[in-house]
Amino acid sequence: MVEREDCSASLWRNRTYDRLKLHLAKEFCELPHMSYPIDAPTYIPKDQFVKYLDNYIERFNIQPKYLTAIESCSYDEGRKCWLSMARKMTTSVGVRYTSRFLVVASGENSADNIPMIPGLHGFAGDVIHSSRYKSGANYSGKNVLVVGCGNSGMEIAYDLASHGANTSIVIRSPVHIVTKELIRLGMTFVQHTPVNIVDDFLVRMSNFVFGDLSMHGIVRPKQGPLLLKAKTGRSAVIDVGTVGLIKNGTIKVHGNISKIKGNKVEFEHSEKRGFDDIVFATGYKSTANAWLKNGESMLNNEGLPKKEFPNHWKGANGLYCAGLAKRGLAGIAMDAKDIANDILSSYHP
């Protein structure tokens, strides 16, 4: 196992905001063969989650080779094996690995994704990706725009407003808003009940809790939250208080950005507004295709699985991927079990 960072769980340790907790209940966020401590809270704070991962590594004696960057992996047809070239980042010494099996577990979050917007490079204020955002404490009194309405974007907007920033958020696409209690119920019920029935329940209850949000710029997708997650990997937003601040006008909602000039952002319908800073909560992208050769049996041009979940994890010639299906920790655990069982069944010394 090679890892380019100097620690495990570098995203959680170094590239997450201070108030982050797991958005799903702990029973849906466990890795194989190890539960959380019995006294752990239902929704795990990030520091406790990192501790869980540290304990997992220690318990199963996992020994990653840190600060080792993969440069290329290719399949040798003649030798029927994978050849991987890596480099130790501390010494620049090259290392070669030969293996019968290769597991791509570099994640969906390998690189920040910031969309191309006309004029962005000339923006007069600070522009950061959500991976660099820590707290709204330094933004008090500033006009801040959050781009992206997933869980990170909505929670960052709430954090900014709570610290006194004049906060706006760009909501470009339909999105489901639910409570953490509702999504926990839904994920429990769907194990025994058809997904369309559970989705109907979730939508009805969410409408009861939040009311009609379309007048505030938030429109629900046509597909239900669980089916949408299963089909596209897009998660429902679990409200932490953002909706209330949108309703009372504390957080302003805008549509798509047309262009930026100086510190002025022009939105669709020619609406313009000045901002001091912009936070892009626009997700991440896979970089697997930059180093994986002969992976076309498994990954598309974006470095994500070609096949739909749950048949996405296996390619040709002993190639596998884990954690690329946009299914969170539960999906990672499923991938790990499927891959381990498949390797075990096909391994003949």
Predicted regions mapped to residue ranges:
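Flavin (primarily FAD) cofactor-binding/catalytic cores of flavoenzymes
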Residues: 1-11, 41-151, 155-349
